[in-house]
Swiss-Prot record:
It comes from the Bacteria. Disulfide bonds: none annotated. One of its GO terms (biological process) is photosynthesis. Residues 113-139 are annotated as: Disordered. It comes from Thermosynechococcus vestitus (strain NIES-2133 / IAM M-273 / BP-1). Residues 116-130 have a biased composition (Polar residues). Belongs to the PsaD family. InterPro entries: PsaD, PsaD_sf. The lineage of its organism: Bacteria, Bacillati, Cyanobacteriota, Cyanophyceae, Acaryochloridales. The gene is psaD. One of its GO terms (cellular component) is photosystem I reaction center. PsaD can form complexes with ferredoxin and ferredoxin-oxidoreductase in photosystem I (PS I) reaction center. This is Photosystem I reaction center subunit II. Keywords: Photosynthesis, Photosystem I.
Amino acid sequence: MTTLTGQPPLYGGSTGGLLSAADTEEKYAITWTSPKEQVFEMPTAGAAVMREGENLVYFARKEQCLALAAQQLRPRKINDYKIYRIFPDGETVLIHPKDGVFPEKVNKGREAVNSVPRSIGQNPNPSQLKFTGKKPYDP
């Protein structure tokens, strides 16, 4: 079981209604390290001040964690965030990045999906492929 560490940002509002559903179902947490104290917008409305060092925020939905990461952390060049699912029994599971490397980064051993081994300039003309049974995305 993973123990999450970090301090919550300075925030005067709510985190989108964890309420009692999080105790009976699941909740999500996002952790990141900030190089300095700075203001950011919460995905559940309002603004908060992330603290220098490790930060930890709980949300009711995974999408709220992803929104915070994509819209607030990445533009600030904070790329060490991790998203966890926390079950009612206390079990914590890392859900993003699943294998420790973000999806858009190259990871040795990760197979390319929907990859065509050519540049855009080498794509065939679709009008020449019409009625041949070949698709423009075929290698």
